[in-house]
Amino acid sequence: MASAKAQEEGVKPLPKGIYYKVLAEGKADEKHPTPRSIVTAHYTGRTINGKQFDSSLGGVPLAIRLCDLIEGWIIAMQQMCVGDKWEVYIPAEMGYGKFSQPGIPGGSTLIFEIELLGIA
């Protein structure tokens, strides 16, 4: 399902079947996070059918070590700069795989809108 998004205008590929679309650009000369970086981000997560399962909007941004997130986030966020806002399409095997999570059936393609606010 994530590969179907690749046909849409403005959608670009990343490794391992992940795709993204730039919604807003930060400063291109900013540093990129590494897996050991602590990233601060606002996000909204949806399944491929559009059902929202999580969001930090209207609350406190997520602040976490990047390597503690799902592989799809790790791959995508290492390409982002502070101020970037992307819609990221993550195939199940780069998300939660065959395992269900609250509000997410096993085997689900995930769509995250991620805005990178900071890197430490």
Question: Where are the model-predicted features located?
Answer:
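Cross-family detector of peptidyl-prolyl cis-trans isomerase
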Residues: 1-120
